[in-house]
């Protein structure tokens, strides 16, 4: 039986195993508090997130279960990895992940990025997305603050709010809206993995320009800014809009012509412009895939088809539609924690 110690962080009781020491708060979100800590077993610095009251409602219990299942499934060099998980005597859940030094948002607000860094960061983002998408998973919330980077420029997509949480002191925090694909923003249709390619394209453009590409004040303004660059959506896209109100809104807008990307991104490499144009396409069916983007000439310095893996199996979403009581989710969660430690022990033996 693991031994637990208690400590107060920001008025919150952290009840963690003796394996972790030197807790320091690094962020707080709606669902939990994150601290950096020293892992006594490995000597590494880690991030420890406490999930607040995971079993207080069926919705929270299901959300926590989903996040754990996803992190266990998505094992890849460019995705944040789960190194430990435990449930305290108070029945709070703690996720332990790698700790990386910074994130892309902080980098972008501190200095312009040189071309080789833009290429390398984009390559790693797309390499991670290729794996995520092959597992039948959509990130849905890709943005610079969800992309963690260490001193070696290794990049990891921080998925599902489980790793580093937004620093409350961070200035100039950018809304998720800036990176949201039009088909999500205007609820046109059932969206798919292409929404992540749009977000990655927005991040790519921001790395080139040093500022957000589509900084909308609200969804209407956001859409207007997008059309100023991409022009009016083509008819085959407008025809897919299910909402009558959204359809009326889009049809009421004045016709706009697409601005040539070479004109917008005057100092960008022609290959960068070509790839960006393939990522930022109104019609999700015509957006380039992560796998094809990796093979684009712009990423040739890093592209290695033998080292861009896909998932062994598609993620099992069968639990998603289950409407279960908290106690059932709790039993399922304990089972997942147990299987994680059994799997971890097998890997180490």
Swiss-Prot record:
Which molecular-function annotations from GO does this UniProt entry contain?
ATP binding; MAP kinase activity; protein serine kinase activity; protein serine/threonine kinase activity; RNA polymerase II CTD heptapeptide repeat kinase activity
Keyword set for this entry?
A: Activator, ATP-binding, Cytoplasm, Kinase, Nucleotide-binding, Nucleus, Phosphoprotein, Serine/threonine-protein kinase, Transcription, Transcription regulation, Transferase
The signal sequence is: none
Loss of function: phenotype: Sensitive to methyl methanesulfonate (MMS, causes DNA breaks), hydroxyurea (HU, ribonucleotide reductase inhibitor), thiabendazole (TBZ), sirolimus (TORC1 inhibitor), and cold.
Phosphoserine, modified sites: 175
Q: Major place of localization?
A: cytoplasm
What compartments host this protein? Cytoplasm; Nucleus
What are its cofactors?
A: Mg(2+)
Q: Cite a GO CC annotation.
A: cytoplasmic stress granule
Positions carrying Phosphothreonine are 171, 176
Oligomeric form and interacting partners: Interacts with cdc37, cmk2, hal4, sin1 and srk1.
- Specify the domain of life of the species encoding this protein: Eukaryota
| Maturation and modification | Dually phosphorylated on Thr-171 and Tyr-173, which activates the enzyme. Phosphorylated by wis1 in response to osmotic stress, nutrient limitation, hydrogen peroxide and arsenite. Dephosphorylated by pyp1 and pyp2.
Q: What does this protein do?
A: Proline-directed serine/threonine-protein kinase involved in a signal transduction pathway that is activated by changes in the osmolarity of the extracellular environment. Controls osmotic regulation of transcription of target genes. Involved in osmoregulation and stress response pathways leading to an efficient start of sexual differentiation. Supports translation initiation and facilitates adaptation to environmental stress in part through reducing eIF2-alpha phosphorylation. Links the cell-cycle G2/M control with changes in the extracellular environment that affect cell physiology.
In this chain the Protein kinase domain maps to 20-299
Q: Which GO terms describe its biological process?
A: cellular response to osmotic stress; cellular response to oxidative stress; negative regulation of cytoplasmic translational initiation in response to stress; negative regulation of G2/M transition of mitotic cell cycle; negative regulation of induction of conjugation with cellular fusion; osmosensory signaling pathway; p38MAPK cascade; positive regulation of G2/M transition of mitotic cell cycle
The sequence motif named TXY is recorded at: 171-173, 176-178
UniProt note on regulation of activity: Activated by the MAPK kinase wisl, and negatively regulated by pypl and pyp2 tyrosine phosphatases.
Q: Does the keyword Amino-acid biosynthesis apply?
A: no
Give the Enzyme Commission number. 2.7.11.24
Name the residues annotated as catalytic in the UniProt entry: 141
Q: What is known of its domains?
A: The TXY motif contains the threonine and tyrosine residues whose phosphorylation activates the MAP kinases.
List Phosphotyrosine occurrences by residue.
173
PANTHER family the record matches: MITOGEN-ACTIVATED PROTEIN KINASE
Under which name does UniProt file this protein? Answer: Mitogen-activated protein kinase sty1
**Its catalytic activity?**
L-seryl-[protein] + ATP = O-phospho-L-seryl-[protein] + ADP + H(+); L-threonyl-[protein] + ATP = O-phospho-L-threonyl-[protein] + ADP + H(+)
């Amino acid at each position: 039986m693991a031994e637990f110690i208690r400590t107060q962080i920001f008025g919150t009781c952290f009840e963690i195993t003796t394996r972790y020491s030197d807790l320091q708060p690094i962020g707080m979100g709606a669902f939990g508090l994150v601290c950096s800590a020293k892992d006594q077993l490995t000597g590494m610095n880690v991030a420890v997130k406490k999930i607040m009251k995971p079993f207080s409602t069926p919705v929270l219990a299901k959300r926590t279960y989903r996040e754990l299942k996803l992190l266990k499934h998505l094992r890849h060099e460019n995705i944040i990895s789960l190194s430990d998980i435990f449930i305290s005597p108070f029945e709070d859940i703690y996720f332990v992940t790698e700790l990386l030094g910074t994130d892309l948002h902080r980098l972008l607000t501190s200095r312009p990025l040189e071309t080789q860094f833009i290429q390398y960061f984009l390559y790693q983002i797309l390499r991670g997305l290729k794996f995520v998408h092959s597992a039948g998973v959509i990130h849905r919330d890709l943005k610079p603050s969800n992309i963690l980077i260490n001193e070696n420029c290794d990049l990891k997509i921080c998925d599902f709010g489980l790793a580093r949480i937004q620093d409350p002191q961070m200035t100039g925090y950018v809304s998720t809206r800036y990176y949201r694909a039009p088909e999500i923003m205007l609820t046109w249709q059932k969206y798919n993995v292409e929404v992540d390619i749009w977000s990655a394209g927005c991040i790519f453009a921001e790395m080139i320009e040093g500022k957000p590409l589509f900084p909308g004040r609200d969804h209407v303004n956001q859409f207007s800014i997008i059309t100023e660059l991409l022009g009016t959506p083509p008819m085959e896209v407008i025809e897919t809009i299910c909402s009558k109100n959204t359809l009326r809104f889009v049809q009421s807008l004045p016709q706009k012509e697409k601005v040539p990307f070479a004109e917008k991104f005057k100092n960008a490499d022609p290959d960068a412009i070509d790839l960006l144009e393939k990522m930022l396409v109104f019609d999700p069916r015509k957006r380039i895939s992560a796998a094809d983007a990796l093979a684009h000439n712009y990423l040739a310095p890093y592209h290695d088809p033998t080292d861009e893996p896909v998932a062994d199996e598609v993620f099992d979403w069968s639990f998603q539609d289950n409407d279960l009581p908290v106690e059932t989710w709790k039993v399922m969660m304990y089972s997942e924690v147990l299987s994680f430690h059994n799997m971890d022990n097998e890997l180490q033996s």
